[in-house]
Amino acid sequence: MDKNRIEGAAKQVKGSVKEAIGRVTGDKSTELEGAAEKNIGKVQRKAGELADDVRDATKSTR
């Protein structure tokens, strides 16, 4: 499993928590930071999934 997949998933969770805290406390800045971090994590996780798919495809063609 690609490390970007794991790190991205962790960023998604952290961002979701931060976003929720911002929403509950009424801190729009924290909410937006959390949403941004969540989306960055989603992109990083997808990049890791793609790397895994490419790795698996190259293994199966050998």
From Swiss-Prot:
Official protein name in the record: UPF0337 protein XCC0070
Family annotation (PANTHER family): UPF0337 PROTEIN YJBJ
Annotated spans, Disordered: 32-62
Gene3D superfamilies: YjbJ
Organism: Xanthomonas campestris pv. campestris (strain ATCC 33913 / DSM 3586 / NCPPB 528 / LMG 568 / P 25)
Transmembrane feature ranges: none
The family this protein is said to belong to: Belongs to the UPF0337 (CsbD) family.
Pfam family, any one: CsbD
